[in-house]
Amino acid sequence: METEQDEMGQEEMSPEMALDKDPFQLTVEDVYDISHVVGQDLLKINREARGVSSLVSDLQFKIVRVLEMLEALVNQSSLSAEELKMERDNLKAEVDRLLRDGPQMGVGPDKMVIDLTDPNRPRFTLQELRDVLQERNKLKVQLLVAQDELQCYKSGIIPSPDDQIVTLENESIITSSPRSNASKEKSTVKSLFSFKQGKNT
């Protein structure tokens, strides 16, 4: 049993296994194993075929060059992978440090933490929201005043400008339509609008 396990372990560790690996998972040792396998095959060819030794030696130089290039590529990729791992570790350490120091530096009882990935996060300052609400309230008041004014015109409490005839004689105003005392009293809204109309004319 032990001999079977040893044979299986040797098969798993045999240099030819490097040829079956994914190219992106090759290590420098795998390149050396491939070099060993190719070298053994070249020796067999050289022994069996006596007339092709010059062809085998030319082929051997080309194979050595390809293996050197492969070794350089594997070295570079393993170095790049190591650099990436080191960079990842450095970034993790930096994030951990910021998380430890963050609550002490930036957050206080009068500060708010905003999650930038939250789609429902606030997008305006509190003062901007207050300004918008005040402007909305002013516009509502103006709308209500205009609606009251319109209602007064419709009900006849305030006569339309067509009912009034104004003549200027010695700076006196004469009107032709009779009005009651209640209709003579102008509201501040009416005086405001008449003041504005007087400016426009």
From Swiss-Prot:
<dbReference type="InterPro" id="IPR051241">
    <property type="entry name" value="DZIP_RILPL"/>
</dbReference>
<dbReference type="GO" id="GO:0051959">
    <property type="term" value="F:dynein light intermediate chain binding"/>
</dbReference>
<dbReference type="Pfam" id="PF11461">
    <property type="entry name" value="RILP"/>
</dbReference>
<feature type="region of interest" description="Disordered">
    <location>
        <begin position="175"/>
        <end position="201"/>
    </location>
</feature>
<dbReference type="GO" id="GO:0005813">
    <property type="term" value="C:centrosome"/>
</dbReference>
<comment type="similarity">
    <text>Belongs to the RILPL family.</text>
</comment>
<keyword id="KW-0813">Transport</keyword>
<dbReference type="GO" id="GO:0031267">
    <property type="term" value="F:small GTPase binding"/>
</dbReference>
<dbReference type="GO" id="GO:0003382">
    <property type="term" value="P:epithelial cell morphogenesis"/>
</dbReference>
<dbReference type="GO" id="GO:0016020">
    <property type="term" value="C:membrane"/>
</dbReference>
<feature type="domain" description="RH1">
    <location>
        <begin position="14"/>
        <end position="108"/>
    </location>
</feature>
<dbReference type="GO" id="GO:0046983">
    <property type="term" value="F:protein dimerization activity"/>
</dbReference>
<keyword id="KW-0206">Cytoskeleton</keyword>
<dbReference type="InterPro" id="IPR034743">
    <property type="entry name" value="RH1"/>
</dbReference>
<dbReference type="InterPro" id="IPR034744">
    <property type="entry name" value="RH2"/>
</dbReference>
<keyword id="KW-0969">Cilium</keyword>
<dbReference type="GO" id="GO:1903445">
    <property type="term" value="P:protein transport from ciliary membrane to plasma membrane"/>
</dbReference>
<keyword id="KW-0653">Protein transport</keyword>
<keyword id="KW-0963">Cytoplasm</keyword>
<keyword id="KW-0175">Coiled coil</keyword>
<dbReference type="GO" id="GO:0060271">
    <property type="term" value="P:cilium assembly"/>
</dbReference>
<protein>
    <recommendedName>
        <fullName>RILP-like protein 2</fullName>
    </recommendedName>
</protein>
<dbReference type="GO" id="GO:0005929">
    <property type="term" value="C:cilium"/>
</dbReference>
<feature type="domain" description="RH2">
    <location>
        <begin position="121"/>
        <end position="197"/>
    </location>
</feature>
<dbReference type="Pfam" id="PF09744">
    <property type="entry name" value="RH1"/>
</dbReference>
<keyword id="KW-0966">Cell projection</keyword>
<feature type="coiled-coil region">
    <location>
        <begin position="67"/>
        <end position="155"/>
    </location>
</feature>
<dbReference type="InterPro" id="IPR021563">
    <property type="entry name" value="RILP_dimer"/>
</dbReference>
<comment type="function">
    <text>Involved in cell shape and neuronal morphogenesis, positively regulating the establishment and maintenance of dendritic spines. Plays a role in cellular protein transport.</text>
</comment>
<dbReference type="GO" id="GO:0005829">
    <property type="term" value="C:cytosol"/>
</dbReference>
<dbReference type="GO" id="GO:0036064">
    <property type="term" value="C:ciliary basal body"/>
</dbReference>
